[in-house]
Amino acid sequence: MVKLLSGLEGSQTSLKLQLYPFDAETTIQTGATGTLDDGGELTLPAQLTYDDGTAYTGAVRVQSHYYNPAEQGFLEAAPGNMSAIGADGNIYTLESYGMYAVELSDASGNALHIPDGATAKLRFPLPANYSSVPQEIPLWSMDEASGKWIEEGVATLQDGFVEAEVAHFSWWNIDVPLNPVTVCMRLVDATGAALSGFPYKISSSDQSIAYAVGWTDADGAFCAQVAATFPSAINIVWNDELILVANIDAFSEDTDLGDILVDMGGFYSLTGKAV
């Protein structure tokens, strides 16, 4: 798992990791098509290779996990932090339409790879609650050294799937790139006291796209990347519920919002027996 930890200089912050096992394992012959986790499909090239370049044909053990962007814990589970480097060299934040982790091995567990010059066909299922999907979506793979997504081509909408040709396997992500700005703020209660260690989530104003998740630092502060020129919603997570704190306007440049008041009156409750 690769995650990027963001925080203010000199502050202490927290990071939550949500780890998933491979949910599906299947056997696919080289040159054939098989199913992946959550209904995706994989078509292998006629030949694969071992680490040393030796050719392999035959039965391939395929393990996969699908990261559904519509699920609540998507950002915690996804590698990186949705920060990406486009083919033009610019930095983006990503709106995901689906993500796969795939590993290939032989029956003994030895890793297998796509040979140079070959590709595999990876087909992503469509998230059920997405009302529309672009005909073409940029394709991204995870660079484990930097923790950023790297643009590597285009996936296309085909027969109810989003289809891509991939030349290697790690994490693959289909996303629309958005220009990012950094928004900083400090969450405080009615007395002005810092809300330290509070889980937050920054989303689009309609809550359909999650931009960032994390925890406030010891001073109740945090900074997050959001999509430029789009309004956003600031939320905290309380008792596993997403609670809207404030809506913020669209910004075209990095912005410090200062203190954001969180009305804690309805959140705290005490239980017990008076004696």
Please state what every model-predicted region is.
Residues 2-7, 241-253:
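Edge beta-strands of extracellular beta-sandwich domains
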Residues 39-88:
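Predominantly extracellular/luminal regions of secreted and cell-surface proteins
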Residues 236-238:
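Conserved structural position at the C-terminal beta-strand
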Residues 42-44, 56, 92, 112, ...:
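Short, isolated positions in well-ordered beta-strands
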Residues 1-2, 6-37, 49-50, 69-70, ...:
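Proteolytic cleavage junctions
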